[in-house]
Amino acid sequence: STNVDCRFVDNSSLFFPPADIVSCRQIHSDVIKIVDESMRGTEIPDCDALITNAPNLPLLIRTADCVPVVLFDECRRVVANIHSGRVGTQKQIVRKTVEMMRSQFGSSPSDIIAAMGPHICGKCYEVDAACASEFGEKFVVGFSKDQKPLIDIASACKEQLESSGVYSKNIFISEICTAESPEWPSWRRDKCSERLGTFIVLE
């Protein structure tokens, strides 16, 4: 894995107007929406991934332990921003987003670069047996002190990318664990409302 550049920024540090941001009202789903110029500055209801080919249209996803996944097809000039939590990952939202980029914009998965931002790591993501079963045994990386399964959710996202045809060399995964790092928002650790914002925008 490769470290993804992760920084705190305020509005004055953004290279686009905050009023242009397109976000989504996340519902832990596999619902994906295509964003066009008419949606600039809006919140898209009831979805967990956004795709656009419009320039200078920033897409925002909010997370606090879930995996933020950004996709960039340099050839077709298409980007996507994905909130891949437990439910979304189980429902294959990352794979489905790649498929929508291919079907709606003509993207070739081999041209897509993917990056995952800070998220909860396998040492910290404790789930029950039923949840672990839904993920599959290969993503169980150990057991907690209470003998509950520990899941590597980023590896599940990575497999979806690879199975879609995205090259392993084009997948970058942040090594920052939100649960282990107090400077990053973590629902598991703090049960707080604070969120990490992940942006992607075509210049």
Question: Which residues fall in each region the model found?
Answer:
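Active-site microenvironment for binding and transforming phosphate-containing groups
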Residues: 1-203
